[in-house]
């Protein structure tokens, strides 16, 4: 099924039908436009973009102009908007609230005269009607909100009404009184006896974001856009709800004045309204310009600034500035001849989803993307739109073949807003036929792939996270530049001189496929890379102009790469870019497990047994080292890099690798720490790894705990993994020295704080020495601090230590402590 009119050949063309077909088409268009107008103006729940409504309206308008006999009194072309809501008191407008005729510019055309042809025609009509060589126009943004009329008697607000159908609207006085931007009493000593002001109620972008955040927090439905939020808020029967919605208002015209002089120009009206206390849009957005060229310049300037404005607009408005000229031009049936709304390229449009694919970002985030039938929206042709994440795709139920509403605002990445379900491709339900009533969607619901589309690594989505990620951090082509940039960082491998530009070009030109390739780079590779990069960017260095080749930077970079071949194990682990593994966690792994070989073999439960490593971090570590592509990349890296400080596992592991501790970290349902201790007292890990379900029934534990344990063990691979964990644990414990042999470190259990500048040690060097001696470095002084090491220009931390009576050391005192003195 398609929307009638889809495929229409152009914005002004009239399709040639036999007369009966023209009558049918006109009736069809009237029915569609009445329905869409009701959804937009009355229900505040539009189902099609504004651009689609405008296109159908203009088709009907062109059809009626070509065939006047088709025009009827209730045609949407003779109306302004929707009917008033029944729940509000109806108000007849003393001066009808007419809408404006629309002009459009085809921003795909390069010739300004062609692009703004409708604008030029408007200016020509105005000049001809006034018999004037040039006309001044007042300009202003076309707000995307809800038009209202405000009536003041003797300076006091007595009535507020919506536009409704232009002749009659709804009285919303109590709600409008809650809008702080609207004056309840006019400024000035002598207000007019009667004043009717018209303007727009709207919601600022920031207030819209706050409102939707509040809606989400309460579990309520969010609003699609600021216009819907403003309209829905103003039409609340309970004005207390309106008061909570942070509505704004801008005045843009005067409808009637009594007992005061009416300014002679529109610009004068705006200046007068400002003195009376009305908010009007900033001066820079409402200049007075001359002729079609001035109008076109204003249009393009505001179009460029649109995304940065604090409110939504969908075009601009031009009005003949002088009131006497407005009166001379008069009105047509539905709009003034002296004003026109110039619509921006639609920010929303209908198109079809041809495919759904996945993009992998530099950090491994996997984003579903809709491949679209090309559509012009927001000033550009859009062929792709983000679907954000799997949850969003399912919430909107976007499928291949769907007709969707696509939105592009400013420089924002195009997104799929919603699906037009009435146009979803359907097929007979399974087991049915073409004549049966049952139908089902032709295309299935979207499912995120389990393997990365770039490298084939496993896709991991952590509990509570909306984003799924590729686990092949070291090997994934999409993540290559980011992975290398992190790897080379100062606190990681500290490869000085290897910046983002060089990394991107090394990857782009194929010199580096992974981190291991850095160590195979030759001087000529770097020089050739830079020559190509400069050429691509149109840069000619001074040395090249002089016929020379600057190579010192490349020699220094090769030296820096070579200097990183024997890093501390903790730095190497941090450099791998494992998700959730920061500097502190990397140090814990290095201190407790000692070697990369052992770390690579550990399952999640063993990682979780280490201090300060929780389940999420443990799972991330295990997933990283279990991924085949990462394993290959790590093998290649370790052929070039050898950690300088590998050592035997920490003797303290003996206290953490007992059966009860490991069982408690396996996340077995119902197996609490207490139950883990009870189970470990009866059976070993090795026994559980080989046990049959019936053997578990003999355990002295509650039946629900035993059943949960049995179900967990029955999952494929669980018993083998448990047996492997037990075997690795036993191997580690067997390698540990006897308890008596384990020498205590000089700063074991001590917390130190560094402040000021030390004579010979940098902050990082001092921290490394303290941690190697078993101590912990904290960033703040407290009663639990054992020592503060103070250098020159020590600040508030020194004063805090003196206040708390904490021992204070200089660098010599620290060295003495490290030596065990």
UniProtKB/Swiss-Prot annotation:
Belongs to the NAD-dependent DNA ligase family. LigA subfamily. DNA ligase that catalyzes the formation of phosphodiester linkages between 5'-phosphoryl and 3'-hydroxyl groups in double-stranded DNA using NAD as a coenzyme and as the energy source for the reaction. It is essential for DNA replication and repair of damaged DNA. SMART domains: BRCT, LIGANc. It is an enzyme of class 6 (ligase). Residues 742-821 form the BRCT domain. SUPFAM superfamilies: BRCT domain (SSF52113), DNA ligase/mRNA capping enzyme, catalytic domain (SSF56091), Nucleic acid-binding proteins (SSF50249), RuvA domain 2-like (SSF47781). It catalyses: NAD(+) + (deoxyribonucleotide)n-3'-hydroxyl + 5'-phospho-(deoxyribonucleotide)m = (deoxyribonucleotide)n+m + AMP + beta-nicotinamide D-nucleotide. NAD(+) binds at residues 50-54, 99-100, 140, 163, 200, 319, 343. The active site is at residue 142. Its cofactor is Mg(2+); Mn(2+). Its EC number is 6.5.1.2. The gene is ligA. GO terms for biological process: DNA repair; DNA replication. This is DNA ligase. GO terms for cellular component: cytosol. Pfam families: BRCT (PF00533), DNA_ligase_aden (PF01653), DNA_ligase_OB (PF03120), DNA_ligase_ZBD (PF03119), HHH_2 (PF12826).
